Swiss-Prot record:
<dbReference type="GO" id="GO:0019450">
    <property type="term" value="P:L-cysteine catabolic process to pyruvate"/>
</dbReference>
<dbReference type="Pfam" id="PF03313">
    <property type="entry name" value="SDH_alpha"/>
</dbReference>
<dbReference type="GO" id="GO:0080146">
    <property type="term" value="F:L-cysteine desulfhydrase activity"/>
</dbReference>
<comment type="similarity">
    <text>Belongs to the UPF0597 family.</text>
</comment>
<dbReference type="InterPro" id="IPR005130">
    <property type="entry name" value="Ser_deHydtase-like_asu"/>
</dbReference>
<dbReference type="InterPro" id="IPR021144">
    <property type="entry name" value="UPF0597"/>
</dbReference>
<protein>
    <recommendedName>
        <fullName>UPF0597 protein THA_1286</fullName>
    </recommendedName>
</protein>
Length: 402
C-alpha cells in the first residue's frame, strides 16, 4: 500500500543521514558491548563509497565539526539507538569533548557495495566484539553479532524492499491516492511541513547563509533549510527517501505557499511531491551519483506545484518530464553546505516548469532522455544513473581538497 511506503520513506532525522547511519551503528554497538571509553580497544567501520562520500565534509548535528570519525564517536558515547535517525538528538558539549579523544580509536574503510552499507566492529580491550551491519536503508539494522553469537539476522534483498513496492504503481495511481489519502498520512504531511519550515526559519538567521542567493521568498526557505542542516544545526528535518535535503526540497516549495491556498490543497500537493520523489528514487536508488535535492526532488515539487495550481494529470506528468529533462546530470559531489545552491537551482526549475506545464508547454518526447510516458522517462533515469557510477569513485579524489 502507498500508505506503508510513505511511512517507511518519510522520517525525521537530526543531521545528514549518512553520518547518522554511522552514528546509529556505533550507538547500537555500544548498547551490546557496553564498554567505557577507557575499556574500548578500537572501532573498525566499513562503508560503501556513497555513504563515505556524503560524510566527508558535512557538519555533524550539535557541532561545528565534520567527519565520519566524529559521527562514529558521538554515536558510541551519547547516541540513543532506539531513536533511529534521531540517534544524535541529545549531543552536548561534554559528549563532544570525549568524542574528540575517541576519534583516534576509529578506523574507516570503503568497499564497492552498490547500496548503503555500514559495518561496524567494536572491540574491547579484553577482545570481546560486537558487529553491527546496516544495509540498504539508513536505519535498517540487518545483523547483530556479539562475539560469535548472531542475535539478529535479516538479510537485505534489494529487490524486496518497501521502496521497490512503489514501482507497482503508475503516476496516475499515485495521483488517485493523493486525491483520497489516508487521514494519518495527511496529518503526518502537516507535521513534516512544520518541521521543515522551522529549520528553514532558523537557517535564515544564520550569518552568511546561502538563502541570500535566492531570488524570492519561497526559494529562500529551501536554501536556508538545506544550509542549516548541512551546517550541523541541532534541529530535526523530515527526510524523504533517506535524505533530509530531498525532504526540504520537495516539501518547502509548496509549503511556503500556505497563505495562498487552502490547507487541504497544500497538504495534498505536498504529498504528491513527496510520493513522486520517492517514486523516482526507487529507480535511481537511495544513494546515487545524481543530486537528489537539486534534481530528483525538483521533479517532485514541479508535480506538486502543478497540482496546486489546478493542473490536470497530463500537465503534472509533463512537469515531471520537463524537470527531469532539464536537471538530470546534476551530480552529487558529497553532502555539504553548497548543496543549498543546488537545491535553489532545482526549486527555480520546478517553479518555471510548473508554469510552462499549466500553459501546455512541454519538452517534446525524444528530446534527450524525455519519453512520451513519464514512467518510461523515470526508468531511463534509473538506467542512466547506473551507467555513471564511476563518478562516485573518481569524485572521492577531490572532496575536501582545496
Amino acid at each position: 500500500m502507498i500508505k506503508d511506503i510513505f511511512f517507511d520513506q518519510v522520517k525525521p532525522a537530526y543531521g545528514c543521514t549518512e553520518p547518522i547511519a554511522v552514528a546509529l551503528s556505533t550507538a547500537t554497538a555500544k548498547k551490546y558491548l557496553n564498554e567505557t571509553l577507557e575499556d574500548l580497544k578500537e572501532i573498525n567501520i566499513t562503508l560503501d563509497k556513497n555513504t563515505y562520500k556524503n560524510g566527508l565534509v558535512v557538519n555533524i548535528p550539535g557541532t561545528n565539526i565534520f567527519g565520519l570519525e566524529i559521527a562514529a564517536a558521538l554515536g558510541y558515547l551519547c547516541g540513543i539507538p532506539e531513536k533511529g535517525l534521531e540517534v544524535l538528538k541529545d549531543v552536548n558539549s561534554q559528549c563532544l569533548s570525549k568524542a574528540t579523544n575517541l576519534k583516534n580509536k576509529i578506523k574507516i574503510e570503503i568497499n564497492d557495495m552498490p547500496y548503503l552499507y555500514v559495518e561496524t566492529i567494536a572491540v574491547s580491550k579484553d577482545n570481546h566484539t560486537v558487529k553491527i551491519l546496516i544495509e540498504g536503508k539508513h536505519d535498517n539494522i540487518a545483523k547483530i553479532t556479539i562475539d560469535s553469537n548472531t542475535i539478529l539476522d535479516k538479510p537485505f534483498n534489494p529487490s524486496k524492499t518497501t521502496l521497490e513496492n512503489i514501482k507497482k504503481y503508475s503516476i496516475d495511481e499515485i495521483i488517485d491516492y493523493v486525491e483520497n489519502p489516508d487521514k494519518e498520512v495527511l496529518d503526518y504531511v502537516e507535521k513534516a511541513i512544520e518541521m521543515n519550515i522551522d529549520i528553514a526559519k532558523y537557517g535564515m538567521q544564520m550569518k552568511g547563509n546561502f538563502s541570500n542567493a535566492a531570488i524570492n521568498e519561497y526559494v529562500k526557505y529551501v536554501s536556508a533549510g538545506v544550509d542549516a542542516r548541512m551546517s550541523g544545526v541541532l534541529k530535526p528535518v523530515m527526510t524523504v527517501a533517506g535524505s533530509g535535503n530531498q525532504g526540504l526540497s520537495c516539501i518547502l516549495p509548496i509549503a511556503t505557499k500556505r497563505e495562498e491556498y487552502d490547507k487541504e490543497k497544500i497538504l495534498k500537493a505536498t504529498l504528491l511531491s513527496i510520493l513522486v520523489t520517492i517514486y523516482i528514487k526507487a529507480y535511481t536508488g537511495l544513494l546515487t551519483p545524481i543530486c537528489g535535492a537539486g534534481s530528483i526532488s525538483a521533479a517532485g515539487s514541479a508535480a506538486g506545484l502543478t497540482y496546486l495550481k489546478g493542473g490536470n494529470r497530463q500537465q503534472i506528468k509533463n512537469a515531471i518530464n520537463d524537470t527531469i529533462g532539464t536537471l538530470f546530470g546534476l551530480t552529487c559531489d558529497g553532502a555539504k553546505r553548497g548543496c543549498a545552491l543546488k537545491a535553489v537551482t532545482g526549486t527555480l526549475t520546478a517553479i518555471q516548469v510548473s508554469e510552462l506545464a499549466i500553459n501546455n508547454i512541454d519538452v517534446p518526447c525524444g528530446n534527450g532522455i524525455v519519453a512520451k510516458d513519464v514512467e518510461e522517462t523515470i526508468r531511463r533515469v534509473g538506467k542512466l544513473t547506473n551507467s555513471v557510477k564511476q563518478f562516485d569513485k573518481d569524485v572521492l579524489d577531490y572532496i575536501g581538497k582545496c
